[in-house]
Amino acid sequence: MKEIIFALPPSTENTAELYDYYKKSNCKIKIYDYPSFKTAGKKRQLREFEIEDLLFRKPIEISDEKTLGYYANKVVLITGGGGSIGSELCRQLAKMSPKQIIILDIYENGVYDVQQELKFKYGNKLDLEVEIASITDKDAMSVVFEKYHPDIVINAAAHKHVPLMEHNCVEAIKNNVFGTENVLELCEEYGVDRFMMVSTDKAVNPTNVMGATKRMCEMIAQSYATRGKVKCSCTRFGNVLGSAGSVIPLFKRQIAAGGPVTLTDKRIIRYFMTIPEASQLVLQSGAIAKNGEIFVLDMGQPIKIYDLAKNMIKLSAAQNIEIIETGLRPGEKLYEELLVRTDELDTTENDLIFVEKEKPISYDEVE
């Protein structure tokens, strides 16, 4: 026996249990996607066991009318729109019949890729504009706001690499904190209805520069919410599978090179979600937001990075690849804190989305 094919309904428990059993067999594991209402009538093929399958839970999908209707006929500006999350936000929004999408990023290659992808898929049915600018350049951003007068601004522009930001803290503050404040000031000036910020679990009790800057961004956004001119909300989520600079591409490169696979500590655990899940969470939380909320997602059980590395090596069918510990980096946590404690959270109409109860500080205090 050389291959094992999973042709099962998407049941978290069963899939995880069977995977644990069969991964010891040295057989290649493939998946035949089980027919569902959405895939009925479509051609299905055998596929490789992908990284997303290692979450062993159903993908989170948004199909509620409230979210879909909220973005219809709106002009939406996405900063950092060429990045992993930003580009997926563009893909998701394109399905929601917006009046116009403006993709803004300083990284032109990422913007170009998503622009071409959406043009090919939607053609003239989608009003799509691209602007190359940095959120740290307020004058350039002002030109963009004057040109488009967006209804909704989603701020996904940020420096996110923890080790790099430890050594480049001035740039982290300049881009993440002051850049976010630039965007918020312009939102007020140009009468934007809603500002939504992409945040991170590293903003909870931060131990590194990147997390501290994102916590500052949350506080700034909440302080602007108290002024009543722009509705503001923030959305926290954990590590995103396959995003640029994440551990998954690193492990893939190391496995392809024959090893070793390096991780800082075998005890590290992280919450994970897919890029589409993270993007949909941002969009749904924005649609249900009132003003000043920090949203967090129940992402299920955290995953050991060591187990993830072992599973990736197993899926690659590579032999004799060693896993080496390199030691925790400055500011790195063994355990990320996302939901903190359930008694600190309020529920929402979505069972997977919660709101932190912490009261925002005033604009004067932030200043």
Located regions from the model:
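N-terminal Rossmann NAD(P)H-binding glycine-rich loop of SDR-like oxidoreductase domains
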Residues: 76-96
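Conserved glycine-rich Rossmann-like NAD(P)H-binding loop of the short-chain dehydrogenase/reductase
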Residues: 98-113
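Conserved Rossmann-fold cofactor-binding substructure of NAD(P)-dependent oxidoreductases
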Residues: 129-152, 331
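A solvent-exposed beta-alpha-beta segment
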Residues: 1-37, 109-113, 121, 128-129, ...
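Conserved Rossmann-fold NAD(P)-dependent oxidoreductase catalytic core, especially the SDR/UDP-sugar
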Residues: 23-28, 32, 39-41, 155, ...
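Proline-aspartate-enriched helix->loop->beta-strand connector
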Residues: 1-4, 98-99, 145-154, 162, ...
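Flexible, Lys/Arg-rich cytosolic regulatory linkers and terminal tails that connect or flank
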Residues: 15-75, 188
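Strand-loop microenvironment adjacent to phosphate/nucleotide-handling motifs in alpha/beta enzyme folds
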Residues: 2, 26, 66-68, 219, ...
